[in-house]
Amino acid sequence: MTLQQFADWLAATPPSHFLQDNEAWAIPVIQTVHIVGIGITMGSAFMLTLRVAGVSGMDQTLLDAQRRYLPWLTGALLLLLASGALLVVGEPAREFFSLSFRLKMLLVALCATIAGWFGRSVARRPAHWEERSRRDRKLRVIAATTLLLWIAIIFLGRFIAYDNVWGAWSPAAQQG
């Protein structure tokens, strides 16, 4: 099955028809939920980044900061997964053939992997990471880069609707 065939099949399913038939209210509701998830994700990622960088939150250990914000980050990512999946079901071809969508998914996977790795690493060796967060510039650069990646994800998500800015690079341009 090609990606186009899968998109056509998905667009013909009852959930997709429901979203297409009720797009005047369903899509804005789903997008609002998605935006709330983005806000929670960015807030959590920002606070953790500030703590790792030693800029804020130094009154708590790195492990405490992780315990405080990682559940919010995880929950928000699950919310984004659910709302994002519904947005894909509503317009599968638009999403699947969008360079912005593909790049966004790649960066989401990268950021989720980094967050998971870092979370497990801190939980296993909290003293090591606590000391390292106070003196290691590379760790600060990684934290800041991760935050910039989350911002890029937001940018790419918004640009799904304007994927033609990529011109011939976009798979959508090659489709049509």
Place the predicted regions along the sequence by residue.
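Polytopic transmembrane helical bundles with strong interfacial aromatic enrichment
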Residues: 1-176
